[in-house]
From Swiss-Prot:
Role this protein plays: Destroys radicals which are normally produced within the cells and which are toxic to biological systems.
The protein's name: Superoxide dismutase [Cu-Zn]
Family membership: Belongs to the Cu-Zn superoxide dismutase family.
Region (Disordered): 16-52
Location(s) in or outside the cell: Cytoplasm
Length: 120
């Protein structure tokens, strides 16, 4: 239930495969082999987009601008999954054994494959 936890980890994962839900999307997108971190950190996975907040209706409006997740080139996110996690992302600073790999954001709530629908 998105209203019980105000923040939800938000990440681009390595794979766009959602055949087994979010379990098949792989780890966070990390083409440069860095540790997990906050979106503004120098040392972070490219797919680390921090947290989003959903309203009481469960809807979150998200607008992301980030130089580490381009739509073209070697580090393109096209074809990868964008995942909303049930728990907040501790941004690599929580001291938990998973902080430096996943932000300890645990299970996924929902996912979607990311792609270009058309060119305008």
């Amino acid at each position: 239930n998105s209203s019980s936890v105000p923040l939800h980890g938000f990440h681009v994962h390595a794979l766009g495969d959602t055949t087994n839900g979010c379990m098949s999307t792989g780890p966070h997108f990390n083409p440069t082999g860095k540790e997990h971190g906050a979106p503004q950190d120098e040392n972070r996975h490219a797919g680390d987009l921090g947290n989003i907040t959903a309203g009481a209706d469960g809807v979150a409006n998200v607008n992301v601008s980030d130089s580490q997740i381009p739509l073209t080139g070697a580090h393109s996110i096209i074809g990868r999954a964008v995942v909303v996690h049930a728990d907040p992302d501790d941004l690599g600073k929580g001291g938990h054994e998973l902080s430096k790999t996943t932000g300890n954001s645990n299970s996924s709530m929902d996912s979607c494959a990311h792609g270009i629908q058309g060119i305008l």
